[in-house]
Amino acid sequence: MSAKWEKTEENTGVLTIEVEADKVNDALDKAFKKVVKKVNVPGFRKGKVPRGLFEKQFGVESLYQDAIDILLPEAYANAVEETGIYPVDRPEIDVESIGKNEPLIVKATVTVKPEVKLGDYKGLEVEVPSTDVTDEDVEAELKKLQEQHAELVVLEEGEIANGDTAVIDFAGYVDGEAFEGGTAENYSLEIGSNSFIPGFEEQLVGLKSGEEKDVEVTFPEEYHAEELAGKPATFKVKVHDIKRKELPELDDEFAKDVNEKVETLDELKNELRSTLEEQKKTASENAVRDSLLEKAAEQAEINVPEAMIETETDRMLQEFGQRLQAQGMNLDMYFQFSGQTEEDMRNQFKEDAEKRVRVNLTLEAIAEAENVEVSEEEIEEEFQKMADMYQRSVEEIKALLAAQGGTDNVKGDLKLRKAIDVLVENSKEVTTES
């Protein structure tokens, strides 16, 4: 087999592949054995038609496509390796010639990974957010804990106020007719949560337990149920109970209830301060890294192929779908409720997808420029970290990752991390207030 690469445009070229005649003949033999099992010829059982008779009746050309399907995957992979190109999309295949006792000649139009001309990636200035934790930060975190451990207590007397939870029955009507999903009993609604149609919750403020009211609202124009969008509606509402948050006292008992490691409120505050310091440190490091990545990518000259942007957009859409599944939802349901289409979402993702691709290409170029190497020991350490994180054996982790590139992917990720380290270690830090 021989292969030749000719660049025709910046990120595109033609890969000419020639496969020897003897391999073509072997592939034609395999193709015949496959096809003859499906052929009906009077006087012969399926699979028993002689080769000569088959070719006379159907022509050897009838075997060409199957022979190409047999030869091309391996030939293309070998040609890519031999020429050292890096395809980023499926090739467009044009079969120049194939025949019995003749070589297979194929021209594949291929989009390849673009060249990257790095700008100045060392000495980049970066603002470092402050990691200081103030007393106000600790008090705010303590207040959150207090809110999280609040109890809802039924009011014996009083009116609904913002922040209360109202237990209600409601029945909705549009044009005097009830509609699907517009009725519920003993529904707990937090006033001010904005979880209902705009204007609904506000009209419950001031009502007492046992009172009833007709709530007049208008469905938003972009409402997911098209038959209701933009229409006025009346909801008949009855209030059963009003529940109000009762905050626990901030004392030593509260501290012990929320954190078994502490005995006093002061100890809890110290724990909160330590946690906040760690969070701010991580956030600061991430902000520095992201800023440097953005600057390095902006200074690099890269003509990103559309195919790479589309692939990254696909990945982002898949990631979003996985996050929805974790919440008991899927993309189809999301599109129905949000009124968006897949095309809308792809368009939203496209700009970020291109940025992601540019950043990764820049990091790969930095790793190459800095001769970054990853040892087998480092790869094994990474597998061990994954095994510890997911509580699986290293062998299980390797088996799970095998279908996704396995060791090569892990090695690639480690190289990118080291390239990020190069950026950070060679940057000029400018400390700012948070």
Curated annotation (Swiss-Prot):
Single GO BP term: protein unfolding
SUPFAM superfamilies: FKBP-like (SSF54534), Triger factor/SurA peptide-binding domain-like (SSF109998), Trigger factor ribosome-binding domain (SSF102735)
Pfam families xrefs: FKBP_C, Trigger_C, Trigger_N
PROSITE patterns: FKBP_PPIASE (PS50059)
Top EC group: isomerase
Catalytic activity as recorded in UniProt: [protein]-peptidylproline (omega=180) = [protein]-peptidylproline (omega=0)
Keywords in alphabetical order: Cell cycle, Cell division, Chaperone, Cytoplasm, Isomerase, Rotamase
Keyword Chaperone: yes
Annotated ranges, domain PPIase FKBP-type: 163-248
GO terms, molecular function: peptidyl-prolyl cis-trans isomerase activity; protein folding chaperone; ribosome binding
Enzyme Commission number, as recorded: 5.2.1.8
Location(s), subcellular: Cytoplasm
Family: Belongs to the FKBP-type PPIase family. Tig subfamily.
UniProt name for this protein: Trigger factor
Organism taxonomic ancestry: Bacteria, Bacillati, Bacillota, Bacilli, Bacillales
